[in-house]
């Protein structure tokens, strides 16, 4: 379903909320653990939740397994092309789990390199609990985000039929793509515009890279990869000064901090006139970051699906912890200041931020998942 159609469907559902309140109340059910959900079928997901929190996310951590689970949501969902369908070709099924079902094909596509590890970790849970791969990928991504302090309350809907064929190659953006290419790709996938593209990249706040630089694994995009905050949008605007590893890799540019990686697409989107002001708008604005990402994550997880035929099981997703009280929403890391910022937004000045005390240090790598 095209993104604008999705927005219309969501708006219609919201407009009917009051009128259908009595019906919704009757449908609500109490699960065996005492939790109340919007539909009795959602209760089974609490068992999945307990299992993956303990045995996939290492007791509910915002670590490598969580980061890769979030990445998997995007790579599964964005593989849909109405433009290809209009040409009589199969354009992929969007958020249908095809990347896991056809794990001998899609993980071998260049932008998906490295996702085989999280797919192999997730598949036993899919088989154990008898859920569809598409639903599990969306669920694991939402739970993963809930483990990251500062993240929004994530939505989760069930009702995805398993994919019947793999998505075609070439539908997942690459780190070396131009801004024009990426905007065109997300517009084709769901009629997303350049602002909504920036919202998607909020996920890089809790992310790391394993396969851009083959010499170094677990390189984060910002200095707080375990917290869903706007540091990613601050630090990608720092002047590039070094490579954290070998350098000269396709899709990588110099980063502004030791131990931190910067991919070409993030660098150019932070500086392009079409996206720079939206990029900067997240700096020191946690409420906007949270609300925009909550919206775009739901839209991504429903690409290729009919929202009206799905069941809202968002009650199962935990509420994330707040950002630690000893940190501001946005800040300059030790040793950094306004003089390090390459501001690209011509409309508004860069927000005034405090510089944390102490000496400049290298950003720590993210340990890989066990067995990876």
UniProtKB/Swiss-Prot annotation:
Enzyme Commission number(s) of this protein: 1.11.1.14
Positions of the pro-segment in this chain: 22-28
Record GO biological process: cellular response to oxidative stress; hydrogen peroxide catabolic process; lignin catabolic process; response to reactive oxygen species
Molecular function GO labels: diarylpropane peroxidase activity; heme binding; metal ion binding
Residues where Ca(2+) 2 binds: 205, 222, 224, 227, 229
Active site: 75
Glycosylation sites recorded in the entry for this protein: 285
Disulfides per UniProt: 31-43, 42-313, 62-148, 277-345
Catalytic class of the enzyme: oxidoreductase
Metabolic or biological pathway: Secondary metabolite metabolism; lignin degradation
Binding note for cofactor: Binds 1 heme b (iron(II)-protoporphyrin IX) group per subunit.
Catalytic activity: 1-(3,4-dimethoxyphenyl)-2-(2-methoxyphenoxy)propane-1,3-diol + H2O2 = 3,4-dimethoxybenzaldehyde + guaiacol + glycolaldehyde + H2O; 2 (3,4-dimethoxyphenyl)methanol + H2O2 = 2 (3,4-dimethoxyphenyl)methanol radical + 2 H2O
SUPFAM superfamilies xref list: Heme-dependent peroxidases (SSF48113)
Signal peptide annotation: 1-21
Origin superkingdom: Eukaryota
Residues reported to bind Ca(2+) 1: 76, 94, 96, 98
pH note: Optimum pH is 2.5.
Task performed by this protein: Depolymerization of lignin. Catalyzes the C(alpha)-C(beta) cleavage of the propyl side chains of lignin.
Family, per entry: Belongs to the peroxidase family. Ligninase subfamily.
UniProt protein name: Ligninase A
Native species: Phanerodontia chrysosporium
